[in-house]
Curated annotation (Swiss-Prot):
GO cellular component entries: cytoplasm
Domain of life per record: Eukaryota
Species of the source: Echinococcus granulosus (Hydatid tapeworm)
Residue intervals of the BAR domain: 18-238
Name of the protein this chain belongs to: Hydatid disease diagnostic antigen P-29
Signal peptide start and end residues: none
One family name in Pfam for this protein: BAR
């Protein structure tokens, strides 16, 4: 494994600084490459926004994550569980004062306990078939693309740094030296650019392919809400 190259790092820093003040020339990426990089740069924010909203939707938050760390075997208590428990408690306490209401409260409590089970199954399914897949995309495919982007920028800086040195060469010997370096840099840049472009294309294709995971989410919602509707219809005698 190559070690840290102080000289290259300094040259890249100097080249970038010169570009910021329009002192040094900068090799432009092809339009397609620039467009792909722009899209990839936005993907983390897009995916993170969806993950955060979905985790909130399925009752995953910082508190529940901490609770899971200490009580992995304990089922999470959902809001549906809490409502079912409240209905059950009031049913028991009001049986004498309101027998008909008490009976219906008991039935409603049972309905909510079954819906709570359906909710837990739904939450778990969404976590494994949607959230985890999005996180995996972030941590593997998108991470690889970001590394490729960094590598491409580094070889681009190396190329432009040596072009600047060639431009400022004072002697024939210096000019010959930097011409050779530039030729080598151009070869490296072309190779890394093609490798990076392949990774960028793959990343955008896989990002678009997350539509499959979105359908998994919608399907899980459909099944959950149908289960809840069925429980309610049974109690209503429909």
């Amino acid at each position: 494994m190559s070690g840290f190259d102080v000289t290259k790092t300094f040259n890249r820093f100097t080249q970038r600084a010169g570009e910021l003040v329009n002192k040094n020339e900068k090799t432009s990426y092809p339009t397609r490459t620039s467009d792909l990089i722009h899209e990839i740069d936005q993907m983390k924010a897009w995916i993170s926004k969806i993950i955060t909203a979905t985790e909130e939707f399925v009752d995953i938050n910082i508190a529940s994550k901490v609770a899971d760390a200490f009580q992995k075997n304990k089922e999470k208590i959902t809001t549906t569980d809490k409502l079912g428990t409240a209905l059950e408690q009031v049913a028991s306490q009001s049986e004498k004062a309101a027998p008909q209401l008490s009976k219906m409260l008991t039935e409603a409590s049972d309905v909510h306990q079954r819906m709570a089970t359906a909710r837990k199954n739904f939450n778990s399914e969404v976590n494994t078939t949607f959230i985890e897949d999005l996180k995996n995309f972030l941590n593997t495919t998108l991470s690889e693309a970001q590394k490729a982007k960094t590598k491409l920028e580094e070889v681009r800086l190396d190329l432009d740094s040596d072009k600047t040195k060639l431009k400022n060469a004072k002697t024939a010997e210096q000019k010959a030296k930097w011409e050779a370096e530039v030729r080598k840099d151009e070869s490296d840049f072309d190779r890394v650019h093609q490798e990076s472009l392949t990774i960028f294309e793959k990343t955008c294709k896989e990002f678009d392919g997350l539509s499959v995971q979105l359908l998994d989410l919608i399907r899980a919602e459909k099944n959950y809400y149908e289960a809840c509707a069925k429980e309610c219809s049974m109690m209503l005698g429909e």
